[in-house]
C-alpha cells in the first residue's frame, strides 16, 4: 500500500483523494501516474522526517518521470533532504540539476545562497576572511537571482544584501 494511503493527517488524506481523482480525470500514462505516486509518497515521508524512505521514493519517481519540469521538483526535494542532513555539497548538486531543468525555482536559489552564506560564516570562524568573501559573494549572487524571480520574498536576504553592500545587481 502506498504511503499516501496510510496517512492519518486530514490534509494529507484530502490531498491524496483530490490527487487520485485528478489522476483519473486527466489523461496521463501509467508511467506518469506511478511517478506521481512515488513523488507524493516521497513528500509524505519527507514531511515526517523519514528521509531514507523519501529518497527511495524520489529516486523511483526520477526513474519514471520524463518531464523536465516535474523532474526539477523531485531534484529540488532531494536537495532539501541533503540540506537537512548537512550534506551541503550533495544538496548543491541537486539544486543545480533542478535549476537546469527549471530556471524559475527561486527556492532552490535561496537554499543555495543559504548554504553559501553558512560556508562563509564557517570561514569567518576558521579565520579565513578571503574564503569568507568568496562564499558571501556567491550567496549574494544566488539571492539576487532568487529575488529577481520572487521580488516580495526573501526579505532577510534583501536586508543582508543592503547591509553588506552587495545589493547592486552586476
Curated annotation (Swiss-Prot):
Report membrane topology.
Peripheral membrane protein
The UniProt entry, under Gene3D superfamilies, shows: Tetratricopeptide repeat domain
Q: Which UniProt keywords are listed? A: Chloroplast, Membrane, Photosynthesis, Plastid, Repeat, Thylakoid, TPR repeat
Instruction: Give the record's GO CC terms.
Output: chloroplast thylakoid membrane
Spell out the subcellular localization from the entry.
Plastid, Chloroplast thylakoid membrane
Q: Where are the TPR repeats?
A: 35-68, 72-105, 120-153
**One record GO biological process:** photosynthesis
Q: Which domain of life is it from?
A: Eukaryota
Q: Which PROSITE patterns match?
A: TPR, TPR_REGION
Q: In its keyword annotation, does this UniProt entry include Thylakoid?
A: yes
Record's SMART domains? Answer: TPR (SM00028)
Q: What family is this protein classified in?
A: Belongs to the Ycf3 family.
Q: What does this protein do?
A: Essential for the assembly of the photosystem I (PSI) complex. May act as a chaperone-like factor to guide the assembly of the PSI subunits.
Name the record gives this protein: Photosystem I assembly protein Ycf3
Amino acid at each position: 500500500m502506498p504511503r499516501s494511503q496510510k496517512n492519518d493527517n486530514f490534509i494529507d488524506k484530502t490531498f491524496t483523494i483530490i490527487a487520485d481523482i485528478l489522476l483519473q480525470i486527466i489523461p496521463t500514462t501509467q508511467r506518469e501516474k506511478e511517478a506521481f505516486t512515488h513523488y507524493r509518497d516521497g513528500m509524505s515521508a519527507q514531511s515526517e522526517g523519514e528521509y531514507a524512505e523519501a529518497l527511495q521514493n524520489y529516486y523511483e519517481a526520477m526513474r519514471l518521470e520524463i518531464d523536465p519540469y516535474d523532474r526539477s521538483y523531485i531534484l529540488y526535494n532531494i536537495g532539501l533532504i541533503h540540506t537537512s542532513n548537512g550534506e551541503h555539497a550533495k544538496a548543491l548538486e541537486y539544486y543545480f540539476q533542478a535549476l537546469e531543468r527549471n530556471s524559475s525555482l527561486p527556492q532552490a536559489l535561496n537554499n543555495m545562497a543559504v548554504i553559501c552564506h553558512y560556508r562563509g560564516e564557517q570561514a569567518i570562524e576558521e579565520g579565513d576572511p578571503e574564503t569568507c568573501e568568496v562564499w558571501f559573494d556567491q550567496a549574494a549572487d544566488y539571492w539576487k537571482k532568487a529575488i529577481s524571480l520572487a521580488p516580495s520574498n526573501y526579505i532577510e536576504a534583501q536586508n543582508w544584501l543592503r547591509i553588506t553592500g552587495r545589493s547592486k545587481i552586476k
